[in-house]
């Protein structure tokens, strides 16, 4: 067993190759949070499969084979929660299973509460109900979520901006997947993604709250018996794209136009000048005192809000704002001027 202590007072231990356990001890909360994160390379088809899988895992399992049974059991655990999400971190996609439960010290005579929760998580992860009707229900939910994002002009501009700037690279891949790919997925695709996730993904188990280290370590080992894996999945990289001054315009019958601009910083999060870049971004467009806010909003009254954001894991920087269509060119010109 390998142990390491972080600068923030946490502890990291290696359970087996490719599986790490992170303890974040704090007395601030009256509950204990558990996060199980599966990390794999970000691929278009796999991203959609894993997004579906995340929904299916938290929907029902073989022991609790209906939504009601799942909900009723969580209620028995004093309102414990269970949810899942997918997210992109540079060249990787994370499937995160999260649960939260009241600390047993606040429940008289319920010291086995954590044992019950870990048994439940074991069922969820190792005995999922991957069936056709669950797939179709989850597909409908995920499709609606993606379409809602596309209906939002600001979010759509961001998505399309990243897709254009990251064409042929990880930056251009949505961690949720796209509707076309989603509708073509079969149950076998999801089952294959599940097996790959369980057997090959790099896994981080994070536990936050007030608890006994030894007891928690024993619970993790007993109920989350992940096998060793050799794969190493990196997250940060530098996007490689030869685009220069590319522009894409789409039209909708709406009052305000949304703008997304992307630059490649060529600075990864482990580069020596990364923190200098963060300071530069703060000055450029992260706060109300920044150049973008003062020049574009305050002095020229072209928009209500404007901000820049580092897309750190991809070595990129984005600027988003919404303006009247007659002010698009002037706004873009001012943004470029402040950037220079």
Where are these regions (language model features)?
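M16 family metallopeptidases and their MPP-like homologs
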Residues: 30-50, 68-120, 155-180, 204-208, ...
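An aromatic/glycine/proline-enriched structural segment found at the starts
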Residues: 171, 175, 180-181, 199-268
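Acidic/histidine-enriched alpha-helical segments
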Residues: 71, 120, 127-147, 234-241, ...
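Active-site SXXK
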Residues: 51-60
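N- or domain-start disorder-to-order transition segments that initiate the globular core
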Residues: 9-33
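Short hydrophobic alpha-helical segments enriched in small aliphatic residues
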Residues: 4-6
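A conserved active-site cap/scaffold subdomain adjacent to cofactor or substrate pockets
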Residues: 266-286
């Amino acid at each position: 067993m390998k142990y390491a202590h972080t600068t923030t007072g946490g502890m990291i231990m290696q359970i087996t190759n490719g599986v790490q356990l992170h303890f974040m001890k704090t007395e601030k909360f009256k509950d204990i949070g558990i996060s199980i994160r599966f990390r794999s390379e970000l691929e278009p088809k796999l991203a959609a499969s894993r997004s579906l899988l995340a929904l299916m895992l938290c929907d029902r399992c073989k022991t609790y084979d209906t939504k009601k049974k799942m909900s009723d059991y969580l209620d028995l655990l004093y309102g414990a929660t269970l949810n899942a999400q997918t997210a992109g971190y540079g060249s990787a996609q994370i499937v995160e299973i999260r649960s939260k439960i009241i600390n047993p010290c606040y429940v008289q005579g319920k010291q086995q509460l954590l044992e019950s929760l870990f048994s439940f998580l074991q069922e969820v992860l190792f005995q999922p109900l991957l069936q056709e009707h669950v797939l179709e229900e989850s597909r409908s939910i995920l499709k609606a979520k993606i379409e809602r994002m596309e209906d939002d002009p600001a979010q759509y501009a961001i998505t399309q901006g990243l897709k254009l700037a990251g064409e042929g690279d990880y930056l251009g891949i949505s961690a949720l997947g796209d509707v076309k790919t989603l509708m073509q997925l079969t149950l076998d695709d999801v089952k294959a993604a599940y097996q790959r996730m369980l057997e090959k993904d790099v896994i981080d188990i994070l536990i936050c709250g007030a608890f006994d280290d030894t007891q928690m370590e024993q619970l993790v080992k007993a109920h989350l018996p992940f096998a060793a894996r050799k794969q190493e999945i990196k997250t940060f990289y530098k996007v490689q794209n030869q685009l220069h001054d590319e522009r894409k315009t789409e039209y909708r019958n709406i009052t305000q136009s949304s703008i997304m601009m992307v630059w490649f910083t060529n600075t990864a999060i482990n580069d020596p000048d990364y923190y200098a870049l963060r300071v530069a971004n703060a000055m450029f467009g992260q706060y109300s005192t920044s150049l973008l806010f003062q020049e574009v909003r305050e002095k020229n009254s072209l928009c209500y809000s404007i901000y820049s954001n580092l897309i750190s894991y991809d070595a990129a920087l984005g600027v988003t704002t919404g303006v009247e269509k007659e002010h698009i060119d002037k706004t873009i010109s001012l943004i470029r001027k402040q950037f220079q």
